[in-house]
């Protein structure tokens, strides 16, 4: 019997699920808004909430734990330097899930998962150029 089992399996092994949520969390932190299936968005939310709470702590051990989870130092840098100060006063609830209709190919429910007070100008390559220019101006 499957009583008390909280998370979905997504027809993947444990290692594949862990890697999938690590990649989805990294994409969400990078872009601050992603479109994915509704079940993945619902299971991604606690992963990202825990990472932001970890970043709010801000110590070296928390940073190393985040690197172990996300596997990318640049994403962890954004998490600790941009998102943690933004949500310093918020006691949880850093993300929202908005239903986004159904996918054409297989009619699965889609959803947008985003940060609550996200930067609406953070979009793709233009955002990388914008943040790089801002960092360069700050350094000069």
From Swiss-Prot:
The keyword Glycoprotein does not apply. GO terms for cellular component: cytosolic large ribosomal subunit. It comes from the Bacteria. One of its GO terms (molecular function) is structural constituent of ribosome. The keyword DNA-binding does not apply. It holds the Pfam family Ribosomal_L17. One of its GO terms (biological process) is translation. Keywords: Ribonucleoprotein, Ribosomal protein. Belongs to the bacterial ribosomal protein bL17 family. Part of the 50S ribosomal subunit. Contacts protein L32. This is Large ribosomal subunit protein bL17. It comes from Xanthobacter autotrophicus (strain ATCC BAA-1158 / Py2).
């Amino acid at each position: 019997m499957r009583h008390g089992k909280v998370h979905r399996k997504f027809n993947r092994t444990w290692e594949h699920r862990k890697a999938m949520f690590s990649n989805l969390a990294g994409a969400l932190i990078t872009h601050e808004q992603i479109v994915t299936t509704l079940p993945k968005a619902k299971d991604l939310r606690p992963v990202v909430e825990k990472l932001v709470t970890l970043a709010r702590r801000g110590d070296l051990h928390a940073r190393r734990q985040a690197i172990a989870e996300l596997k990318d130092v640049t994403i962890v840098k954004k998490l600790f330097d941009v998102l943690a100060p933004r949500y310093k006063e918020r006691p949880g609830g850093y993300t929202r899930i908005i239903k986004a209709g159904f996918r054409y190919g297989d009619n699965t429910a889609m959803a947008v998962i985003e940060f609550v007070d996200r930067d609406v100008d953070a979009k793709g390559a233009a955002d990388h150029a914008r943040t790089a220019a801002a960092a360069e101006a700050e350094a000069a």
